[in-house]
Amino acid sequence: MADFKLADRLATLPPYLFAGIDKVKAEVAARGVDIISLGIGDPDMPTPDFIIEAMKKAVERPANHQYPSYVGMLEFRQEVANWYGRRFGVSLDPKTEVIGLIGSKEGIAHFPLAFVNPGDLVLVCTPNYPVYHIATGFVGGEVQFIPLVEENDYLPDLDAIPAATWDRAKMIFVNYPNNPTAATAPRAFYEKLIGICRKHNVIIAHDTAYTEVYYDENDKPMSILEVEGAKDVTIEFHSLSKTYNMTGWRVGMAVGNASLVAGLGKVKENVDSGIFQAVQEASIVALRDGDDFCRELRGIYRKRRDVVVAALNKVGIACRVPTAAFYIWAKVPAGYGSSAEFVTAVLEKTGVVLTPGNGFGTPGEGYFRISLTVDTDRLEEAVSRIANL
């Protein structure tokens, strides 16, 4: 059988972070070790019944078995606009400022195709979800990483970026609530970022998939589009995955500047065929009727967060108490040469799957990420195993 050479854009890629973790996990599981997976951010709880029932009804309609719209059903886009208005006080035109996505990852990965030419500079805040820089690299863009450090609350130091860099930049990727650090961004940060990007004509691509996983009803994460002037330069990516335990359904949305939304739509009409309409109809029900479920879900994650933070503190592992997202970003204990070394040792010796901080970028070295995606008993067991390593 012929062995064909990969294209350069693939051959030079590092292994995808979670693919490597899955490989080691499989090897350990094959030895009969009980695995507790706190690696990938995939909710362990099912999609709620009211969404599943809506899906069952939608699947039975023959009209939903045909090709869907590339940009999403107008009814779905209208419900996204309604939800944004209710949740964030943001007004959106569903016809021009909203587009449906086959999960937000799909939209983020395709977005640089619409606006980044070979050699264009794209700023990526790091540690980061790897898709931002990988998608940029696929289209020949030049990536400049902007470090996020604990001393600055994991916000980029915008003043440290020279004016000449802003002049060159075509786009900046930001992500709050942040994966992997669980940091949130205050209004003042967004105001400053928008001011700079409007001045230098830089596109803001904001990934905000975790806004509905927060722990204080009086401190809800905001949309960047709440800030005056944001629509001039911003597209915001959101998802139903984490909000309603729908990671496998592959449904999300991008909203904001009409020309940015249209550009992404131009790419999508040439590379995919849209979201299965039955999924869109069920998603309409989720967005319209899901507030009570989201409140209950936050309560579960709050208990899990508190259990893990207390357990880590008890064994002397330092971590910040997150106010949003279902991740704990903790410091690697002394005695390990790298976060990858620590995570590998934990997995091989205890069966607990963690994510090494350096897998998200150089500033993540010295940290590891815990996903709160198992029940409290298993979380306590996981930390106990780590403590006894």
Swiss-Prot record:
* Biological pathway: Amino-acid biosynthesis; L-lysine biosynthesis via DAP pathway; LL-2,6-diaminopimelate from (S)-tetrahydrodipicolinate (aminotransferase route): step 1/1
Q: Which family does it belong to?
A: Belongs to the class-I pyridoxal-phosphate-dependent aminotransferase family. LL-diaminopimelate aminotransferase subfamily.
Q: Which residues bind substrate?
A: Y16, G41, K105, Y129, N179, R369
Self-association and partners: Homodimer.
Q: Name one Pfam family in it.
A: Aminotran_1_2
Q: Which gene encodes it?
A: dapL
Q: Supply the alphabetized keyword list.
A: Aminotransferase, Pyridoxal phosphate, Transferase
Which CDD domains is this protein grouped with?
A: AAT_like
Q: What does this protein do?
A: Involved in the synthesis of meso-diaminopimelate (m-DAP or DL-DAP), required for both lysine and peptidoglycan biosynthesis. Catalyzes the direct conversion of tetrahydrodipicolinate to LL-diaminopimelate.
Source organism per entry reads Nitratidesulfovibrio vulgaris (strain DSM 19637 / Miyazaki F) (Desulfovibrio vulgaris)
What does the record give as cofactor? pyridoxal 5'-phosphate
| Binding-site list for pyridoxal 5'-phosphate | Y70, S104, K105, Y129, N179, Y210, S239, L240, S241, R250
What GO biological process terms does the UniProt entry carry, in alphabetical order?
lysine biosynthetic process via diaminopimelate
**Official protein name in the record:** LL-diaminopimelate aminotransferase
